């Protein structure tokens, strides 16, 4: 009956996480605009901490996420880079770079 043991483990983990989320209720709407904004900002900061803690609990209690399948990476010794073609220079392009056209007379 290994399935029941896994179910009990999952239910226990969900209870722990529910208690964790219940410990950080959404702030009330009373007070000035600035006070409400500050309470919501602090609540969001705590909520991010609760989210991180809940994911760590899930990872520890349930064995963590499954690893992705192994991807074949090509051999880096076969990697080569082709040289870039030189762009054709135009007179307006040279003037934009601050060079003067040469007068060979």
Swiss-Prot record:
UniProt xrefs under Gene3D superfamilies: 6.10.140.630
Organism: Simian immunodeficiency virus (isolate TAN1)
Ranges of biased composition (kind: Polar residues): 87-105
Superkingdom assignment: Viruses
Domain free text: The RNA-binding motif binds to the RRE, a stem-and-loop structure present in incompletely spliced viral pre-mRNAs. This region also contains the NLS which mediates nuclear localization. These overlapping functions prevent Rev bound to RRE from undesirable return to the nucleus. When Rev binds the RRE, the NLS becomes masked while the NES remains accessible.
Role this protein plays: Escorts unspliced or incompletely spliced viral pre-mRNAs (late transcripts) out of the nucleus of infected cells. These pre-mRNAs carry a recognition sequence called Rev responsive element (RRE) located in the env gene, that is not present in fully spliced viral mRNAs (early transcripts). This function is essential since most viral proteins are translated from unspliced or partially spliced pre-mRNAs which cannot exit the nucleus by the pathway used by fully processed cellular mRNAs.
This protein's encoding gene: rev
GO cellular component, one term: host cell cytoplasm
Name recorded for this polypeptide: Protein Rev
UniProt xrefs under Pfam families: REV (PF00424)
Biological process (GO), any one: mRNA transport
Bias (Basic residues) ranges: 34-47
């Amino acid at each position: 009956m290994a399935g029941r043991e896994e179910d009990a483990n999952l239910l226990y983990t969900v209870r722990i996480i529910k208690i964790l989320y219940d410990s950080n209720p959404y702030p009330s709407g009373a007070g000035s605009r600035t006070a409400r904004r500050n309470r919501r900002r602090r609540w969001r900061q705590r909520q991010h901490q609760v989210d991180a803690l809940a994911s760590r609990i899930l990872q520890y209690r349930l064995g963590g996420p499954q690893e992705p399948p192994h991807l074949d990476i090509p051999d880096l010794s076969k990697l080569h880079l082709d040289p870039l073609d030189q762009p054709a220079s135009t007179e307006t392009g040279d003037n934009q770079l601050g060079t003067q056209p040469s007068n060979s007379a």
